[in-house]
Amino acid sequence: MSDRAITPRGINHLVLNVRDLEVSHRFWTEIIGFRQVAELKNRPFKMRFYSGVSEDGEVTHHDLALAEAPPEAAGQDAWTMQPKRVGLNHVAIAWPDRASWLKQVEFLQNKGVKFLRRVNHGMTHSVYIEDPDGHGIEVLYELPREVWENDIDGAQNFSERLPTEGAEALVDTTDNPVFGGAKVSA
């Protein structure tokens, strides 16, 4: 028997309780791009399952699930990065590379999705949005490991705020600082 916890690979999936399953379904499929892979049947509540796509084009059993809450369920305040409520702050969704991320960010802007924050972190370049139920979503691509691996604390503490509207919100530079090493372009 081990005397300490075994480190997991990571988070497997996220389940969100939502007000209106159809509205949330459209957001997560048409705006974010997840694919619906399953739906619970013969249950007293509605729940659907969604998957992203791996680099090999494969789907999983689910990365995300949406469960419709009863009408009397309490809502939440508008999303903010500051912890003003107990529960989920945000979920981060990664695109495979800078080019696909830039296409997604432009797509979001063209669809009228409000950018709440646009930030270059020390390990990601990110846009923060919210879903129809106010869940915070970080749309990101990860910078190369050599940018942050020698000083994770330094990378976590780096934050460059960028414009959230107009063409400026779509500009992404590759002159990233390197934490604990020489400069690398993403």
Residue ranges and their predicted role:
Residues 2-4, 10-19, 51, 76-186:
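Vicinal oxygen chelate
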Residues 9, 59, 86, 113, ...:
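Structured loop/turn residues at beta-strand edges in well-structured enzyme cores
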